[in-house]
Amino acid sequence: MKSVNIFTDGSCLGNPGPGGIGVVLRYNQHQKKVSQGYFQTTNNRMELRAVIEGLSMLKEACNVTLYSDSQYMKNGITKWIFKWKKSNWKTANGKAVKNKDLWLLLDEKIQIHYIEWKWVKGHSGHYENEICDELAKLGANNPTLEDVGYQPA
């Protein structure tokens, strides 16, 4: 099984507002970068979409080390999602889970991979996180996509 590193970040100019994702995928000496922009979205949706896009780039089951500065994404996929599924997608206080569409998609994407989730402190000089941040901001400043599933509060 191939071992890959995926670095992700999301950005939003206003929250809600235009948003973007940045992804760096590394396999051996190969590297691929992705920047995408969305017209109207939130920061959390961009963090989730960045991870989904990174995993979507993989053509086969892989050992993945995934780096993100989003505690929301990391806690959601490694802890909270199990309770959400059991409670029919309700939070502990009985409210509907936000971004359910993306959580379902992310949950689907992780099933064939072995993933080690790594949190990195944002804006702390972590090289790949800074690249992803730049790619995400580039996308947010040049949106071309609709964030299908986004629902204004």
UniProtKB/Swiss-Prot annotation:
UniProt subunit comment: Monomer.
The protein depicted here goes by the name: Ribonuclease HI
Cellular compartments annotated: Cytoplasm
GO terms assigned for molecular function: magnesium ion binding; nucleic acid binding; RNA-DNA hybrid ribonuclease activity
For this protein, the record's InterPro entries field holds:
RNase_H (IPR050092), RNaseH-like_sf (IPR012337), RNaseH_domain (IPR002156), RNaseH_sf (IPR036397), RNaseHI (IPR022892)
Q: Which PANTHER family match?
A: RIBONUCLEASE H1 (PTHR10642:SF26)
The EC number(s) given in the record are 3.1.26.4
Domain of life of the native organism: Bacteria
Its function, per the record, reads: Endonuclease that specifically degrades the RNA of RNA-DNA hybrids.
Q: Which UniProt keywords apply?
A: Cytoplasm, Endonuclease, Hydrolase, Magnesium, Metal-binding, Nuclease
Enzyme class, UniProt record, top EC level: hydrolase
Q: Where does Mg(2+) 1 bind?
A: D9, E47, D69
Native source organism of the sequence: Haemophilus ducreyi (strain 35000HP / ATCC 700724)
Q: Name one GO biological process term.
A: DNA replication, removal of RNA primer
- Residues the entry annotates as binding Mg(2+) 2: D9, D133
CDD domains (alphabetical) = RNase_HI_prokaryote_like (cd09278)
Q: How many cofactor units bind, and how?
A: Binds 1 Mg(2+) ion per subunit. May bind a second metal ion at a regulatory site, or after substrate binding.
Entries under SUPFAM superfamilies matching the protein: Ribonuclease H-like
Identify one Gene Ontology CC term for this UniProt entry: cytoplasm
Q: Which family does it belong to?
A: Belongs to the RNase H family.
Q: Give the reactions, separated by semicolons, that this protein catalyses.
A: Endonucleolytic cleavage to 5'-phosphomonoester
Cofactor requirement: Mg(2+)
Which residues are in the RNase H type-1 domain? Answer: 1-141
Identify one Pfam family in the record: RNase_H
